């Protein structure tokens, strides 16, 4: 079970990711002062249902594993830049356009 302070910080960052933008698991970790993308992924797997989980993606730009079909309509609704949409299971987020920098000012007060 992830540390409660770490969990709270991860969820606070994810709640602040604007519609149409994404952060990678690593970016979320760096934003809170940690370099633990796997730990961020664990928090999202356990507690991410309460926040916009589709806005946190692997560095590959793929949607969250196992949630590709559920995430696609959310990306389309939010106008998240996508690339290579071949099917509801096969697409990527265009990170060059959609990625929110982990240095963004909206995260300045969320640190471990």
Regions found by a protein language model. Give the residues of each.
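Nucleic acid-binding interface residues in structured DNA/RNA-binding domains
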Residues: 1-112
